[in-house]
UniProtKB/Swiss-Prot annotation:
One of its GO terms (cellular component) is plasma membrane. Keywords: Cell membrane, Membrane, Transmembrane, Transmembrane helix. This is UPF0182 protein SACE_1102. It comes from Saccharopolyspora erythraea (strain ATCC 11635 / DSM 40517 / JCM 4748 / NBRC 13426 / NCIMB 8594 / NRRL 2338). It holds the Pfam family UPF0182. The chain crosses the membrane at residues 10-30, 55-75, 106-126, 168-188, 203-223, 250-270, 279-299. InterPro entries: UPF0182. Residues 899-910 have a biased composition (Pro residues). Residues 707-730, 876-916 are annotated as: Disordered.
Amino acid sequence: MPKLSRRSRILLILGGVVLIALIAGSRLLGTYVDWLWFGEVGRRQVFATQVFSRLGLGVAAGAFVGVVLLLNLWIAYRSRPVFVPVSGPDDPLARYRTVATERSRLFGWGIPIVIAVIAGLTAQSDWQTLQLFLHSVPFGQVDPEFGNDISFYTFQLPFWRFLLSWSFVAITVGFIGALVTHYIFGGIRLAGRSGQVAAPARIQLSVLAGLFVLLKAVDYFLDRYDLLLSDRNSLFTGATYTDLNALMPVKLILMIIAVFCALAFFAAIFLRNLQIPAIATVLLVLSSILVGSVWPALLEQFSVRPNANQREALSIERNLAATRSAFGIGADKVTIKDYPGKTALTPGEVADDEGTIPNIRLLDPNVLSDTFTQLTQQYNFYGFNEKLDVDRYREPNGQLRDYLVALREIDTDGLAQNQQSWINRHMVYTHGNGFIAAPADRVDSTFQEGATQGGYPVFQISDVANGGKGAIPVDNPRVYYGELLNQNDYAIVGGNPGEAPREYDTDRSAYTYAGKGGVPLGSFFNRLVFAGYYGERNFLFNTAIGSDSKIMYERNPRDRVQKVAPWLKLDGDPYPAVVDGKVKWIIDGYTTLDNYPYSQQTQFGQATTDTLTGVERQPNQPINYIRNSVKATVDAYDGSVDLYAVDEKDPVLKAWQGVFPGVVKPAKEISPQLQEHFRYPEDLFKVQRQLLTQYHVTNPGDFFSNRTFWEVPPDPTSSGQGGSNQGNQQPPYYVLAQIEGQNQPTFQLTSALTALKRQNLAAWVSASSDPRDYGKLTVLRLPTDTQTPGPNQVQNQMESTPEVTENRTLFNNPQVTAIFGNLLTLPVAGGLLYVEPIYIQRNETESYPQLARVLVSFGGKVGFSETLAGALEQVFGPGAGQTAGDEPPPGQDSNQPPGQQPPTQQPPAGSPEMTKAVADIRTALESVRSAQQSGNFGRLGAAYQQLDEALKRFEQLGGTGG
C-alpha cells in the first residue's frame, strides 16, 4: 500500500484541524455566550459545575472504555502467532493483516481514541446521576421489603447501574476488539471442522467472557432492588406477589449460577478447552428462561390471578402508603370531609355566604386575552399572552380581591412590514409597557341587547403614561423580560455616553435602559462574539452600539430559571406579580424522581394536559415523586433571577443544594409581600388530583375493585359551544372562596371530580394558596346514595334551558359568536353552585369578547341573566343575589368605552398662540416619523425633545394633556 507524502500528510492534518474547528467553533462560541449570561445573573458556579461534571464524567468514562479496548488490542497483537499459515494466494485476511501490521500504531491508538470519545460524549449526559450520588441525603424513610433508606433507590442505585452499564460496554468492546485482532492475525482459525484457537486467544477471551458473566451476576443482584418498581400489575407500581415470591429468589439463584459460570470461564485458562464454560453458559441461559420466565409466569397464571385480591393485598397496601408519601397526598397534607351536597337553599342562606358569593369570578383568563389586547394597548408591537393570569391583591380597605393580571409585553412578531428592520427589532422596540389588572368579579356595566358597550373588564393600568401610579402602583412599568420573547428576541440597550435615548417608550419620549440587566457590548471582542453567534454583522458596524451598550438575551422568564436550575421541572404557567413596587415573574419549580420504591408511576405530561391553552406543556416523562420545593422570581425590568426554598425538608432539594450551594435561598428570605402572591401551582395540583381519584381509597380490597374510584371530568366547554370533549380534561380554576372550616375567603385552586365512568359529581378538591395554610388540600366527598350532577350534566342542562335555546341575541345569530367561559364549581352553604359566564364576540375584524350573560345552576334549577345577582335570584329567589359582586362600580358611566378616561373640556380654539402650538406639534410628529424611518438616533432624540416642548406649550395654553 503506497505511503502518503509528507506534504499530503500535512495537508490532511490541516484539513482535519479546520474541520474540527468548524464543528467545535459554534459549540465553543455558544459556551462563551452562556458563560457571559451566567455572569450576568451571578450564577457562574452553576455553569462551572455543569461543565466540570460533564467533562469529568465524560473523560472518566471515555478513558475507562478506551483503556480497556487499548489494553485488549495490545495483548491480542503482542500474543499473535509468529507463523500464520495462509489458506492460499487468495486468502482475504492476508491483505488486512498486512495493512494492520503496517498501520499498527494508527489502528492501535486511533480506534480506542475514537471509541473513547464516543463513550465520553454519551456518558457526560448522566452528570446529574453522578452529582446526586455524591451529595446523597437520607430520606429518613425505609422501603418495606429490604429496609433500605429511600435514598439508596433514588440517589445511589442509579449510579451503581451507571457504573455497571459502562463496565458491560467496556468488556464488550474489549472482547470484540480482541476477537477481531486474534482472527486477523491467526490466533483464531475457522478452517477445518472445529477450527483452532491459539492458547493466548483462548486465555484472553475466556477472561473477558468470565468478567462479563461476573458483571451479569452483579446485575442479577441489583435486579432485586429494581423489582420494587415493577410494573407487572397494571393497577399499581411495585413488587407484586409474583415478584416477591418467584422473581426475588430466582434472581439470587441466577446470580449464583452466573458466578459459577464465570469461574468456569476462568478455569478454561488452565483446562485448555472451552467445553466447561460453554456448558455453564448454556445452563445460565436455560435457567434464565425456565426459572426466570416460565416459573413466574406459571405462578402468576395459576395462583395469583385467581386470587389476586388476596395475593396482591400486601403490595397494594405498600403502594398506597408510598404513593401518598411521594406525591404529598398523605393525611398530613390532605383532609377529606364528607359534604352533604344540599340541593335546596333559601335566599337568606345564599345571601349569608359573604365569603364565596361576593367573590365569584366572572372573567375567564382563557377568553379575554383579545379583549385586553384591543382595549389596553395602542400599538401593534405590544401583546399579551394567550392565557391571562389570576392573582389576588388587597384593596385599600384591606379586602382581598382576585384579579386578572397581565403584562403589556413587547411582541416583535407583531411589527408591521415597514417596522421589521434589524434596528427596530433589536434597538428601538426593546421593551413592553405596563402592568394591567382587572377585578375578576365584575365588569364595567351590564351588556344590553343592541348596544356595543357593557360587559368589559374594569381595567387598572400602571404604565409609563401614568408613571406607574395606577391602582396597583409599579415603580418601573417597563417590561424587558416576558413570555412572548423567544430565543431570537435579543435587545441591545444603552449606547454611547451622552447620546440621545433611542428605545421607544411613548409617542412623546424615548428611553435609555438604566438597569443592571444585560451583557456588556462595549468591547470589540464581545461584539465580534455576538456577531458570530447570531450571524449578524450589524454588531460590528452599527455606530449606536457604544461603550455603555448591553445585550439582553434569554429573555423568557421560564428559560432563565431553567438555565439557572437545570435540575428543576418548571410549571407551565409563569405569572406576573407586583411585589414591593417591582414587577416579578413567579415560576414554580418541581423536584421529581422516577425511582421511589412502590410509588405509582405517572406520566407527567399526560397528567397535566387539559384544555388550557397558552401554557408550556410538560414533557411526557414518568415520575413517581414530586415536590414544589422551589419558587423562582424573575424581575421583569432587570432580569435578575432568585430562587427560594419553600419545602426545605425535601431530600431531593437538599441534595441539589449540596451540588449548587447558595443558588437557592432559604425560606426565611422570602418577604411577606412576595409570599402573599404565591399560588398553589397548577401542574402539581393536576398530578395530585389525578392520583386522588384513586388514592383517596384506604382499603386494598376497595382499591383492587376500583368501585369507589373517581376521575377528572372532561371539560364541558372545550368545544366552544358547550358539548363534552372526552379527550380533554377540565382545567382546575383559581377562585377566591370560603369553604367549611375557614373564617374568611382564601385564594385557592379547585377542581370537580366525578365518579369513575359516570357523569355525576363525586368530590370537590381545593388547594389553599393562603400563607397561613399554604399547600393544604381539602377534599369534599359527596354522599354516594344521592346523585349530584357533574359538570357535563350541568352544562347540558344549562344549554337546553328554554331561556338559553330561545335567545337569538347570543345563539343562532350570524353576527356574533357565543363563547362559554369556565364552568366554576363552588361550595355554598352545604351545596354546590355552578357558575358560568357567557361571552359574545362579533364576527368582525378586530372584534373581542365581552361578557353578555351569566349562567347559574343549583339543585336542577338554572338561572340565566345579564348579572350574577339576577341569575342567583332566578334560582334561589329574591334577595339571594344581594351580596353578588358583579354590579358596576359606583360612578361608572355605563356608556363610556372601557379603558378610557371621561373627556375633558376642549380648549378654546382660534387664538394665534393655540394655532401655532398645534402646528408645532404636527411638525414635531413629522420629525419623529422621519427620524424613525431613517434610523438616526440623534435625530430621533432631538425630535422627541421637540415634540415634548410643543406639547408642554399646548398644555400651558389650556390644551388637553396626554
